[in-house]
Amino acid sequence: MEKRMKLRVSRIVRSSLSSCRPRDLYDVVETCAVTSKATSSERFFVTKAKTKTPSRPKSHASSCPRASPIFPPNPFYEESRSFRDLRKKVKTNRKQRSQFGSDPLFASRFKSTGSWYWSCSEEEDEGDKEESEDDDSDTLFSSRSFSSDSSKAESFAVVKKSKDPYEDFRTSMVEMIVERQIFAPAELQQLLQCFLSLNSRQHHKVIVQVFLEIYATLFSP
């Protein structure tokens, strides 16, 4: 029994030693060559596979439009606008002043010496030099009636030298409101635009101030 055990142990030791012995140079070189071929083929396959991968066209990348935020309009914007903002947006183009006579709000024709009149002075188109020399010249509305019936009354604009533009504009605006029975907010705003269009910019501040005071008086609780 002991001899058999020794033989088995010796065989196990020999097999382990034989596995640990160095291999021949030929085997090592052949194994490395096979390994290098395998790795090179794998690398070539990977590289080839990458080149064959189809790229996504750029035209489809941005085909979907970007989502933009949509803000609902404010329905109370028009009602909440102050008259100061309205004054800034009033156009002062003198070429449009001739259209004032055909305004449906004021059915009567505003006349001055038998012709359409919409400037502060007859030489206004020559430049602003005359305005600087004649700063106290204002175009005011006069509600003088040629008939007792207000619906048939005719009014005209007058040019006058004024030392107190505030009082003159206030008197003229009140006369127009009473004569034409202008009490609706929309009609009052249109009246303000008419005053601004007929007068130079240097008087717009006074006109708006007078209008705001009259408007507050009419609609005060």
From Swiss-Prot:
| Chain intervals with Acidic residues compositional bias | 124-138
Protein name stated in the entry: Transcription repressor OFP8
Extra facts? Plants over-expressing OFP8 show flat, thick and cyan leaves, and enhanced apical dormancy.
Pfam families listed in its UniProt record: Ovate
Asked if the record carries the keyword Transcription regulation, the reply is: yes
Q: In which tissues is it expressed?
A: Expressed in roots, rosette and cauline leaves, shoots, stems, flower buds and siliques.
Q: Which UniProt keywords are given for this protein, alphabetically ordered? A: Nucleus, Repressor, Transcription, Transcription regulation
* Family matches, as InterPro entries: Ovate, Ovate_C
Compartments it resides in: Nucleus
Give the OVATE domain ranges.
158-217
Recorded phenotype for the gene knockout or disruption: No visible phenotype under normal growth conditions.
A single Gene Ontology CC annotation of this entry is: nucleus
| Major subcellular site | nucleus
At the top level of its lineage, which domain of life is listed?
Answer: Eukaryota
GO biological process, alphabetically ordered: negative regulation of DNA-templated transcription
Q: What does this protein do?
A: Transcriptional repressor that regulates multiple aspects of plant growth and development through the regulation of BEL1-LIKE (BLH) and KNOX TALE (KNAT) homeodomain transcription factors.
In which organism is this protein found? Arabidopsis thaliana
Tell me the PANTHER family matching this sequence: TRANSCRIPTION REPRESSOR OFP7-RELATED, TRANSCRIPTION REPRESSOR OFP8
Region annotated Disordered, chain positions: 124-147
Transmembrane stretches in the record are: none
